[in-house]
Each structure stands twice: as structure tokens, then as C-alpha cells.
Amino acid sequence: IQLWGELKPDLTQEAIKDRALRYCDLAVSQGLLAIRSHVDVCDSRLLAVEALLDVQKQVKPYLDLQLVAFPQDGFYRSENAETNLLKALDLGVEIVGGIPHFERTMEDGRRSVDALCRIAAERGLMVDMHCDESDDPMSRHVESLASATLRFGLQGRVAGSHLTSMHSMDNYYVSKLIPLMAESG
């Protein structure tokens, strides 16, 4: 995340497109038929979004490239993330992303999950969130994601990944969490 933040100011659409097209072609040569990419929306220029939407069109005949509008610097933590995420969706990005554990507080993380799931539900989109990417057993945003999935009727349209905090959670809590995750689809 830190390195990406350092690179962002110097990025160009051409460089992003070139790298993405080379990767897509390499992936297809190895037998891959689908890729899901999380595209940072915290840069107000939306260079990566525009570049990857162009790449998506170019590779469409031979590769299913799904794009996730991803508030890399946090939905609430980054000043323009909400506005930029909505712009990215309006431009054609088809999946709502999130990174609740990167918010400043646990409460902001929970609120970001709700806000992002609400946006997805209102637009009929899928959700793909990086949740709880830490060793902290108290990082429990996957619980919020599972609950919001049920509340907003998003079953079957939500992916939670990078759930590394689960290995640190106590068995009692996990015994309640896993059934909730299963119920949420």
C-alpha cells in the first residue's frame, strides 16, 4: 500500500495499459480465462480506472477481466474515495470494493462495509472486500460484511478475502462467525 502510494503521482495511463495488457496476454498464454483486478479509486485522476476499462474492452474477445472499484486508501480515510468510487462505477467498473481494516477506527470500518454494500445493493452490483488483513483477532470486519450481505440481500454476490485475522480468533467466536458467513452465501 505504501509503495503504491509513492508510485501514484507518477503513473500514466499508457504505462498502466501497457503493463496490464502484457499481464493479460501472459495470463491467457498460461490458460487463464478470467481475472478480477482491484482498481484504486483514491487517485482523483482515476487514471488506473480509465486505463483498465480500456484494457477490459481490448481483451474482451479472449479474457473476462472483472474490475473492482477499490478505495485503496480507505473509504472514509481518503478524502475523495466515495466520490471517486461512484464515478468509477458510473464509468463502467462493475464491482464495489472495500478495505475496512484500513480505516482509522473499527467503527469507520464497519460503517464503510455498510455504505459500500448499500451502494452495491442500490446498483445491483457485486461486492469484493479485503477484510481483516492483519494478525489482530479483534479485526472482525468479515462479520460486518456477512451481516450486511444478509441485510442488503446480496447473497451470492459478495466475496471477502485476505481474512488473515481469522487464524488468531478464538474458537468460540469463530464457531458463531462461520455459520453466519455460510448463511450469507
Regions found by a protein language model. Give the residues of each.
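Residue-level signal for well-ordered alpha-helical segments
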Residues: 4, 9-12, 26-29, 65-66, ...
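Alpha-helical scaffold segments that flank or form the walls of functional sites
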Residues: 1-38, 46-58, 83-90
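A structural signal for isolated positions on well-ordered beta-strands in alpha/beta enzyme cores
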Residues: 36, 66-68, 128, 159
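Conserved short loop/turn motifs at secondary-structure junctions
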Residues: 38-43, 71-73, 103, 133-134
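Histidine/acidic residue-rich metal-binding segments in metalloenzymes
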Residues: 47-61, 77-159, 163-185
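Active-site mouth loops of central-metabolism enzymes
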Residues: 2-18, 68-80, 100-107
